[in-house]
C-alpha cells in the first residue's frame, strides 16, 4: 500500500513495467515497456524537471519568488509546472508551433505563461523557441533558465532513478534498452547506469527523419543537410545537446512521421496503452530492427508520455488523413459502418418462407440477408441462392432454412479493412460487425466503395 504523500512531487518515479503481448508477438524475445505516463505530470520529464529545479535551489540560482523559464516540447514544461506550483515559482514556457494544442492548453491550465514560436527557423534565429527563452531570461530579474538540452542534471536524474528502476524490475536480466532521443537525457542517463551494471547491454536510440542524431553518431559529422521539418514531437533535434552521450549509445534507428503515428495508434488498440506520438516511434524503431534480437534477449522500451496530449493529432482521423498517414487501407470496420450504424440490420428467420426474404431484398435494395434463430446467427442467404431455388421450385414453398448458407463471419469494430477484404475475397458475400448488443453488415460493395 502506498503511503500518504506530502505533495505531488513525491509521487514522481517508480513507474511500472508492462509486458507487450499482441503487438510484440512476432519478436523472438520478451519486450517490456517502461510506461512513464504514470508519473504525475504524465511523462518521463517529471524526473529531470524536479532534479534541475532542486539543483538550482541548492546552488542559489533559483531563489524564492523567482521565475522559471524553459523552452520545451510540452512535457518538461509540465514537470516544471508541478515543481513551480508546489515550490511557489512563476513559470514561463516557450514552445514551437508544431506542438499539439493540448500541450499548450495543459500548460496554461497549470498556471504557466506560454509563448508559441515558429518551428521553421534556425535555432539561433531570434524568434526560435530557444532564442525567445534566452531573451526572457535576460530581461526578467530573478529568473532561472534550466535549458534541459545542456543541463546535465537532465541525464543525472535518469542515472539516479530510471536506470536503477529498470535494472531492479528486470532483476538484472535486461539486454537491450530502447528509447526515443530528444534532449538525450533519458538514453544517456539510463544507458550509463545500465552499462555500469553490465557493459554488454545494448543501448538503442530512436531518431526521426529531419534530425541529425543518427548520421552524427555514425560519422561524427554534423550535417545540416539532414535537417528539415518533421511532424513527430518529442524526439529528434537540429542541434547536439550536451546531454547526448554518443559513447553510451550503440545504435540509432530512424522512423518516419507516418510509421510513428500509426504505431502509436496500434499500441492503443492492441495493448491498451494510450501513449504519446514519440512512444509509437520508439516501438516502431524497435520493430524495424527486431531481427537483431535473439530468444535469449530481454528488451525494455521506454514510453515517454500520455496520449491525452495528442487527441487532436495522432488520435484524430481527419488530422491523420490530411497528412496522408491514414489511407483507405488503414480504415477499420467502424469507418465502414459509420454512415448507416443508426439503421437496423435486416434479417430473416430460418422458418420463414423464401418469398419473405425476396420481398425484403426488393424493399431495401439489398442482395444478402443474415439468418437468425432466437437472436443467434445461424446462416445467410443471397440473391444467387434464392434465384436457383426459385427456378427449381416455382411454387415458392421453400423455407429459408432449406437453402441458407453458412453464417457470415463476425468481426469487431477495430478489424482492418484489409482483413475484411480478405474474408470477402475468400468467398463470403458479407461480414457482420459486432456493435453493442447487435450487428451491422459490411457488404462487398461497401468494401469496393471504401477502397476506390
Locations of the language-model features?
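PLP-dependent amino-acid enzyme catalytic core
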Residues: 1-335
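Methionine-biased hydrophobic packing positions in alpha-helices, especially
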Residues: 48, 52, 337-341, 361, ...
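A short, polar/charged loop-to-alpha-helix boundary motif
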Residues: 385-401, 447-452
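Bateman (tandem CBS) regulatory domains
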Residues: 248, 330-345, 397-408
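Residue-level signal for well-ordered, solvent-exposed loop/turn and beta-edge residues enriched
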Residues: 61, 376, 437-438
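The conserved cystathionine-beta-synthase
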Residues: 346-365, 371-373, 390, 410-429, ...
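Short glycine-/small-residue motifs
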Residues: 379-380, 439-444
Amino acid at each position: 500500500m502506498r503511503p500518504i504523500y506530502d505533495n505531488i512531487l513525491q509521487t514522481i518515479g517508480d513507474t511500472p513495467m508492462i509486458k507487450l503481448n499482441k503487438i510484440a508477438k512476432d519478436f523472438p524475445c520478451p519486450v517490456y515497456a517502461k510506461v512513464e505516463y504514470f508519473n504525475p505530470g504524465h511523462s518521463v520529464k517529471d524526473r529531470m524537471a524536479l532534479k534541475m529545479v532542486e539543483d538550482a535551489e541548492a546552488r542559489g540560482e533559483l531563489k524564492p519568488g523567482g521565475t522559471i523559464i524553459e523552452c520545451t516540447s510540452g512535457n518538461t514544461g509540465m514537470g516544471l509546472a508541478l515543481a513551480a506550483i508546489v515550490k511557489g515559482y512563476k513559470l514561463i514556457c516557450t514552445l514551437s508551433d508544431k506542438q499539439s494544442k493540448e500541450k499548450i492548453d495543459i500548460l496554461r491550465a497549470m498556471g504557466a505563461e506560454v509563448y508559441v514560436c515558429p518551428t521553421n527557423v534556425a535555432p539561433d534565429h531570434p524568434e526560435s523557441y530557444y532564442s525567445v527563452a534566452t531573451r526572457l531570461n535576460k530581461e526578467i530579474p530573478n529568473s532561472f533558465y534550466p535549458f534541459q538540452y545542456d543541463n546535465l542534471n537532465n541525464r543525472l536524474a535518469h542515472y539516479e532513478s530510471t536506470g536503477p528502476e529498470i535494472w531492479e524490475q528486470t532483476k538484472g536480466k535486461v539486454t537491450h534498452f530502447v528509447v526515443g532521443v530528444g534532449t538525450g537525457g533519458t538514453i544517456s542517463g539510463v544507458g550509463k547506469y545500465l552499462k555500469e551494471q553490465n557493459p554488454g547491454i545494448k543501448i538503442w536510440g530512436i531518431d526521426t527523419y529531419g534530425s541529425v542524431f543518427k548520421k552524427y553518431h555514425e560519422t561524427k559529422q554534423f550535417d545540416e543537410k539532414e535537417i528539415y521539418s518533421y511532424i513527430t514531437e518529442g524526439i529528434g533535434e537540429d542541434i547536439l545537446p550536451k546531454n547526448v552521450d554518443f559513447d553510451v549509445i550503440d545504435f540509432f534507428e530512424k522512423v518516419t512521421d507516418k510509421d510513428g503515428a500509426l504505431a502509436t495508434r496500434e499500441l492503443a488498440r492492441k495493448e491498451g496503452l494510450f501513449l504519446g506520438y514519440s512512444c509509437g516511434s520508439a516501438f516502431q524503431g524497435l520493430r524495424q530492427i527486431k531481427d537483431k534480437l535473439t530468444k535469449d534477449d530481454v528488451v525494455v522500451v521506454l514510453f515517454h508520455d500520455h496520449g491525452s496530449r495528442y487527441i487532436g493529432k495522432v488520435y484524430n482521423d481527419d488530422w491523420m488523413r490530411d497528412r496522408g498517414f491514414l489511407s483507405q487501407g488503414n480504415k477499420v470496420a467502424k469507418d465502414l459502418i459509420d454512415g448507416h450504424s443508426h439503421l437496423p440490420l435486416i434479417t430473416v428467420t430460418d422458418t420463414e418462407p423464401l418469398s419473405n426474404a425476396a420481398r425484403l431484398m426488393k424493399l431495401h435494395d439489398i442482395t444478402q440477408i443474415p439468418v437468425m434463430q432466437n437472436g443467434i446467427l445461424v446462416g445467410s442467404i443471397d440473391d444467387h441462392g434464392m434465384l436457383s431455388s426459385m427456378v427449381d421450385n416455382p411454387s415458392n414453398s421453400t423455407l429459408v432454412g432449406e437453402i441458407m448458407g453458412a453464417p457470415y463471419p463476425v468481426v469487431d469494430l477495430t478489424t482492418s479493412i484489409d482483413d475484411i477484404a480478405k474474408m470477402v475475397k475468400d468467398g463470403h458475400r458479407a461480414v457482420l460487425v459486432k456493435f453493442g448488443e447487435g450487428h451491422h453488415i459490411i457488404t462487398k460493395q461497401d468494401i469496393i466503395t471504401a477502397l476506390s
